[in-house]
Amino acid sequence: MQLKIKEIFDQDYTKLEGQKVQIKAWVRSNRDSKKIGFLVLNDGSSLTNLQAVYRVDKISNYEEITAARMWAAVAIEGVIKLTPTAKQPLELEVLNAQILKQSDEDFLLSNNDLSLETLRLNAHLRPRTNLFHAIMKVRATLAFAVHEFMNQNEYSWLAAPLFTGNDAEGAGETFSIQKFDNEEFFGKQTHLSVTGQLQAEAYAQAFGNVYTFGPTFRAEKSHTNRHLAEFWMIEPEMAFVDLKGMQDIVENLIKHVIKAVLEKNQQELEFLAQRNDENLIKKLQKVVDSKFERIEYKDAVKILANAVKSGHQFEDNEIFFGMDLGSEHERYMCETYHQGPVFLQNYPKDIKAFYMKLNDDQQTVASTDLLIPGVGELVGGSQREDNYEKLLKRCQELKMPIESLQWYLDLRRFGYYMSSGFGIGFERLVMYVTGVNNIKDTIPFPRSHGQIEF
């Protein structure tokens, strides 16, 4: 019978002793002597390798198999033999072996001491390392868990457009589409989208609960370990839900996806804990078990100011109401002050987007950021402004192009009672759950300023 390596180790493999199995896999290593050789095999189904023992008196092509290089593709037929006193609990006694495709001698990963930067420059090969195998397995589980949560809670998935005629965030950091045959292809200046939120609001007013989950683009000339030019966003939008209700949904979603990884990817997490953060699994379990605190922005400013007075040093020690909190301030709130996930809420309107609902104090908006230890901001969301006149006034104050946003304004004219939504940078979520330090290591082929290979 043909099996995956994961299938062998995930079952009671003692019952497999003496059984004949077929494996198709890649060679991780191959060592031999005159009479016996040892292949270490991996087929991508697990971080666990399978050792296959081949002998000169058992196979007719012994010399050919001794030449199988690292990452050669092979087909092996053999008998399972238990090895309880050895490092591995079982091995495969080879009866037949075939090299399906040899690997060239200059295979990069033959060098086991490669830096993360070298692997980023060779992103087509890095999934063959244990590190990126583990990261991408966790990423896949997180993505599935997002869709699972949304499906269980009756959200409809929306395929938001990637071309847009407006900058929804108002930050101006968009990629512009070049003219086609010396004319605007869409009849006006067009950009790659930075968010699917505006379109999600339109559908939420018909479906109730919707979400987008797809790529977004931001033209930031940043070379930090926290920024990408192309990244994925999870953006749910809910009609008839206020800020508090939205925070409850955020908390439930974050706990659901982390719990899914804890249940499905224990092997990968144990490897990543050894590689990145020895407390990784405890950290994730703490998030699942904790209650997310909620703190007013104005109170956070007081807490930070008191920290400075008590001798704590930030790079930016000038703390005042109206400031846009930096990553160091956010991390202080969730790592030092609260020591757990915390929602900051009701930010000053001047540092938030135009579409957020103005509070009764006329100074703040019904917005929230979820701060997570080790990352800082992971989720940003708000209750949307439902009053047509207030939204129009805010657009005018910010000198935004009313004509291209008129359809969005018009939603408020037709039963738009209440809507709230949030965005999660998917790669930042992967960073947190895997413990990696650079966001470029959380996406298969990273795109950032000056980098467009592959």
UniProtKB/Swiss-Prot annotation:
SUPFAM superfamilies: Class II aaRS and biotin synthetases, Nucleic acid-binding proteins. It is an enzyme of class 6 (ligase). It is found in: Cytoplasm. Its EC number is 6.1.1.22. One of its GO terms (cellular component) is cytoplasm. PROSITE patterns: AA_TRNA_LIGASE_II. Gene3D superfamilies: Bira Bifunctional Protein, Domain 2, Nucleic acid-binding proteins. Its main location: cytoplasm. GO terms for biological process: asparaginyl-tRNA aminoacylation. InterPro entries: Aa-tRNA-synt_II, aa-tRNA-synth_II, aa-tRNA-synth_II/BPL/LPL, Asn-tRNA-ligase, Asp/Asn-tRNA-synth_IIb, NA-bd_OB-fold, NA-bd_OB_tRNA. It catalyses: tRNA(Asn) + L-asparagine + ATP = L-asparaginyl-tRNA(Asn) + AMP + diphosphate + H(+). Pfam families: tRNA-synt_2, tRNA_anti-codon. Keywords: Aminoacyl-tRNA synthetase, ATP-binding, Cytoplasm, Ligase, Nucleotide-binding, Protein biosynthesis. GO terms for molecular function: asparagine-tRNA ligase activity; ATP binding; nucleic acid binding. PANTHER family: ASPARAGINE--TRNA LIGASE, MITOCHONDRIAL-RELATED, ASPARTYL/LYSYL-TRNA SYNTHETASE. Homodimer. NCBIfam families: asnS, PRK03932.1. Belongs to the class-II aminoacyl-tRNA synthetase family. This is Asparagine--tRNA ligase. It comes from Ureaplasma urealyticum serovar 10 (strain ATCC 33699 / Western).
